[in-house]
Curated annotation (Swiss-Prot):
Domain of life according to the entry: Bacteria
Transmembrane segments: none
Molecular function (Gene Ontology), one example: oxidoreductase activity, acting on single donors with incorporation of molecular oxygen, incorporation of two atoms of oxygen
Protein name, UniProt field: Protein CA_C1420
Protein source organism: Clostridium acetobutylicum (strain ATCC 824 / DSM 792 / JCM 1419 / IAM 19013 / LMG 5710 / NBRC 13948 / NRRL B-527 / VKM B-1787 / 2291 / W)
A matching Pfam family: LigB
Amino acid sequence: MSLNGFYLLPHPPIVVPEVGRGEEKKIENTTKSFEAIAKDIAGKAPNTIIIVTPHGTMFQDYIALAYEDEISGSFKDFRAPNVSMELKINKELTSKIYELAYGERIPSVMATNDILKKYNTSVFLDHGCMVPLYFINKYYKEYKIVHITYAALSDIELYRFGMNVTKAVEELNENAVFIASGDLSHRLREDGPYGYNPAGEKFDKELLNNLKDGNVEGVFSIDKDTVYNAGECGRRSVAVLLGTLEGKKFKGEILSYEGTFGVGYGVMKLEAFSNDTSKLKELERIRKDEYESKKQEKDPYVKLARESLTQYLTTGEAIEEIPDYVTEEMRDLKRGVFVSLKKFGDLRGCIGTIFPVTDNIAEEIIRNAIEAGLNDPRFYEVGKDELVDIDFSVDVLDEPESATREELDPKKYGVIVTHGRKKGLLLPNLEGVNTVEEQLEIALEKADIDSHEDYTIEKFMVTRHKES
């Protein structure tokens, strides 16, 4: 047998009546859709439900497969500790998925309590799983679970992992269904928990329509800025889901979509109806084209940063002769420079200088690009094979000037706090830093300065260069 059910489900705890306490009535269509999906799954009577979630114990660089005899959880973090569940894990299928993924060098880990206790946690059922299962359990309980927490891997790696889920199910002749747990944009309303961004509605519409049409390439071609600004948590679950459908034509049915609370809740059922050509090679082509486009970047600042780290990772030597495309300004001016690396929207390294330590901006970029990739103490060293998925940005700092708290603006100015020899800097216009208080708190923490100590404040502006 093979997978015989494919679903995209949200996970708002508020839809559970014991949590919502009446508020769940505001997303009544989501409730009805959960009920319909639960009945559909009960009709299939699977012996295993495979679910991928954003909210289990997550490793940045390894997909985590829960591997204990049982897994349990409750809604205690959502005011409903009496609503709990305990499920048996299908260890044979979990082990087979891991074995196949490991054989293809897809970063994965069998997450046991012994391993997780090193990180002060354990195997547990998170709300990303429990919300869908709450409704399923009303109609059907004769199943084991495979619990997967995705990681910040490339679309290709997540897709290939999904392919191995299907392969494992087929090799073991399991009767199983697959659930991709994920909310869509978290930025649909000003009064929502994460505010409003027009990219939210755009992302949700594009993702759902592409899934409805069975357009795999369309899903993976959604503009990265749109994905990032939407603030979603479901796209990586969808990448695994699409991998389980590799080689199949499919269509999707949107049972409901609501954004009442500022977060997109999309409920979908996908149905494979015939064989299709492989989409994997096309996705690999898209990824290669994106990388080639990055290497042809026209902005000389980020172009130099990428070439600097690339050459060092390739040859072990830094760029010595400044390339011809470098501008006169970059050759003649001395400025502090920060080089930032992001992988799939998450920070992967950032090192910079408040004041210049080299002869010009170009040399500062060459130096700090290597430092950001290899010597940011928050991260392990960047590998050469990661460069295809990393986006570079370069901030050139203006001269800092003394400032008062009232003169700060986290969107316009960066900030430097100083107490004795302790100094902390935070760049301007950073995601998640919206107030002066937040900006100062982070800068003080970076400098290990207590907020009650006397410290000086400086502000500065930057010219930010990003890959197009």
